[in-house]
Amino acid sequence: MKRTYQPNRRKRKRTHGFLVRSRTPSGRRVLARRRAKGRWKIAV
């Protein structure tokens, strides 16, 4: 059986990257929430 996590750097960046997050209002909300929480990494 194929595992669910098939690592791919490009896909990772394009779906969860900083630029993608900052593009939409909800994504910016995600970044703001993670900044407020004090996350060491706010995006991939």
Swiss-Prot record:
Composition skew (Basic residues), residue ranges: 30-44
Cross-referenced InterPro entries: Ribosomal_bL34 (IPR000271), Ribosomal_bL34_CS (IPR020939)
Keywords of this entry: Ribonucleoprotein, Ribosomal protein
The keyword Ribonucleoprotein is annotated on this UniProt entry: yes
Residues covered by region (Disordered): 21-44
Origin: domain of life: Bacteria
GO biological process: translation
Record keyword Ribonucleoprotein present: yes
Pfam families assigned to the protein according to its UniProt record, in alphabetical order: Ribosomal_L34
Any one GO CC term of the record: ribosome
GO molecular function: structural constituent of ribosome
Family: Belongs to the bacterial ribosomal protein bL34 family.
Protein name: Large ribosomal subunit protein bL34
Organism encoding this protein: Pseudothermotoga lettingae (strain ATCC BAA-301 / DSM 14385 / NBRC 107922 / TMO)
